[in-house]
Amino acid sequence: MRTLWWVLGFVLVGGFGLGYGAGKSLHTERISGSAGDVLEDDPVGRLKVFIYELPSKYNKKILQKDPRCLNHMFAAEIFMHRFLLSSPVRTLNPEEADWFYTPIYTTCDLTPNGLPLPFKSPRMMRSAIQLIASNWPYWNRTEGADHFFVVPHDFGACFHYQEEKAIERGILPLLQRATLVQTFGQRNHVCLKDGSITIPPYAPPQKMQAHLIAQDTPRSIFVYFRGLFYDVNNDPEGGYYARGARAAVWENFKDNPLFDISTDHPTTYYEDMQRAIFCLCPLGWAPWSPRLVEAVVFGCIPVIIADDIVLPFADAIPWEEIGVYVAEADVPNLDTILTSIPIDVILRKQRLLANPSMKQAMLFPQPAQSGDAFHQILNGLARKLPHDNSVFLKPGEKMLNWTAGPVGDLKPW
């Protein structure tokens, strides 16, 4: 019966194309109600942002040293800076600012293999905060409560790529009152504090645009995934990486004809996603990955396997309507779960995914475009206004401990 369902589903579902870019697909559906309104909000006129002018050693010189950072999945911190410099929400008068932004590239320290090294990030962030606190009065009047920082690393402002170490470190103490804009999102986790704005990782829009295929291409792949199932170098026994969820996908479905899964990463990866109905988005070392962005952009229904994940712009994007959540413990039943979804439900998810505004919200295009991820971040900041009077400290009042945290973080940067 499952095979029959898939054949019927292919006939009915396969004709839905991508609809990304020109937005000419007829098979689209707007999100109903307030979610659709929020996604299409225009933040201009609703907030003003003051950008601190920092020495170039905190941003531009770091990028000049390693331009690879522009294409890394953590590049949102760079492009957000560039966007704000020319954004109409920018104000040169700090007295009228609603928010203060510190342009600091804490993830642009890459190994020869392109992996980020966050070990200097806490000292770098601390140095920048000391600078703005010494040269402007605005940090001290709130201790950062009207400031936001982009921290797109694996575990945000915990600044470590290993979860156990990140949990042990916790969020940098000086950022406890600030609003954090971060890719990491997991409920009840020490590296996600209340009030943070969860954003998508950076995926190069031009690169994806270059791999678009005809919108009427049939979706002949039922389930698609490319990536690691085991991380033998860092988790030789195989039970810790992805909490075993990826290993369970491989062991249960490597020989299942409905599942096109492999560790190979072909040159047709983006094209294959456009030929697939479902794209697996399992957790890895962190719960998020660029696959989520790619799936939405290419109209492939994201199958989210990451317990307690907090997804990007969850107050604007109706993830339950466009995706499928599968608990990590239910991975062995993945085939039954997906083949049991009614075809009309799949068709509606595809129509929603075909809506250009849905795709736009996941991207950081150059130049910026209305409704993109930059604007969704601003919308999130605007919705926090006006600031409550409690963010402003009384004369002489202090809440942050400048000597808290690991001893190594206190060394000069």
Task: Put a short name on every predicted segment.
Residues T268-A361:
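Catalytic binding pocket for nucleotide-activated donors in carbohydrate/polymer assembly enzymes
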Residues M1-T263, L352-A354, A361, P365-W413:
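Juxtamembrane luminal stem/stalk of type II transmembrane Golgi/ER carbohydrate-processing enzymes
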